[in-house]
């Protein structure tokens, strides 16, 4: 690396946390941060998958640890951050990534009509995607205000900026809400040296569905997305690594309150 690259994108020694890190986009986030020298805590509710993912990175000599956490449980989230502050003196970068695209049993091919929304499904999706993000951001802000610096990045979606086919109502509502939550928090936390941003991915392989992961969307879903994306394909989780490194590094020192779209150009057709 050149000195300019080192100065702009150096995250070596940064104390990072990624929620929903056991698989998919969250794992890609944790991986790139660890590959670039950050000390990364992978947090997830799925214990076996988290252990396997953490060991996969640790076996490569990367500086990672794991923490079981349900982001919808505010006490568990606060305990996670308290433990991290006690163990490593603070937290520099937090990626609030944990989320649900839908509840178990939801079939994207069937869609969802407004009059058939189940309250329990609505509460579950918003409990993770909105309230869980708030819990994570709030605990991160508490730690970062004490140290006078930090970066919080939320995984939103381009479904928070436009209506997407085959997405459930709770997903649309929660992702739109977290984008505005990011903007409001960025305004308040800026005087404390804390940057707050959102990433809005389009269709990626490895999308979370009901707490599980589908690496292979149905052919119908794949064809639909390919027609809506100017680049003509869905993305691999590795293609999110660039924006992750940017927002975690000194290169983004004057970027806050923004929603960064990574969707192959699909939003420009909205």
Residue ranges, per PLM feature:
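Short, flexible catalytic-loop segment of classical short-chain dehydrogenase/reductase
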Residues: 196, 200-212
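Substrate-binding pocket helix/loop in short-chain dehydrogenase/reductase
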Residues: 105-114, 118-123, 221, 225
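Active-site helix of classical SDR
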Residues: 137, 174, 182
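Short C-terminal tail/terminal secondary-structure segment
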Residues: 2-10, 245, 256-270
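Alpha-helical segment proximal to the catalytic Tyr-Lys
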Residues: 142, 187-188, 253
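Short, small/polar-rich loop/turn modules that mediate ligand/substrate recognition or access, typified
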Residues: 190, 195, 200, 255-257
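Residue(s) in the substrate-gating loop at a strand-loop-helix junction
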Residues: 157
């Amino acid at each position: 690396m050149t000195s300019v690259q080192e100065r702009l994108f150096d995250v070596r020694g940064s104390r990072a946390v990624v929620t929903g890190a056991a698989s998919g986009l969250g794992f890609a986030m944790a991986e790139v941060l660890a590959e670039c020298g950050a000390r990364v805590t992978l947090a997830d509710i799925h214990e076996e998958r988290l252990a396997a993912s953490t060991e996969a990175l640790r076996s490569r000599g990367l500086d990672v640890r794991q923490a079981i956490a349900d982001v919808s449980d505010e006490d568990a989230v606060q305990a996670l951050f308290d433990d991290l502050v006690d163990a490593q003196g603070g937290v520099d970068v937090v990626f609030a990534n944990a989320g649900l695209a839908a509840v178990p049993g939801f079939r994207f091919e069937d869609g969802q009509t407004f009059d058939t929304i189940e309250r329990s499904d609505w509460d579950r999706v918003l409990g993770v995607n909105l309230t869980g993000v708030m819990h994570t951001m709030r605990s991160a802000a508490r730690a970062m205000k004490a140290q006078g610096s930090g970066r919080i990045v939320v995984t939103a979606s381009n479904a928070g900026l436009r209506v997407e086919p085959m997405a459930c109502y709770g997903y649309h509502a929660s992702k739109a809400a977290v984008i505005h939550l990011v903007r409001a928090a960025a305004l308040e936390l800026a005087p404390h040296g804390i940057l707050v941003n959102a990433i809005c991915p389009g269709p990626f392989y490895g999308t979370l569905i009901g707490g599980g992961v589908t690496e292979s969307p149905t052919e119908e879903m794949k064809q639909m997305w390919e027609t809506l994306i100017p680049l003509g394909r869905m993305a691999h989780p590795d293609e999110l690594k660039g924006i992750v490194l940017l927002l975690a590094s000194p290169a983004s020192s004057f970027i806050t309150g923004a929603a960064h779209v990574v969707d192959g150009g699909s939003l420009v057709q909205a």
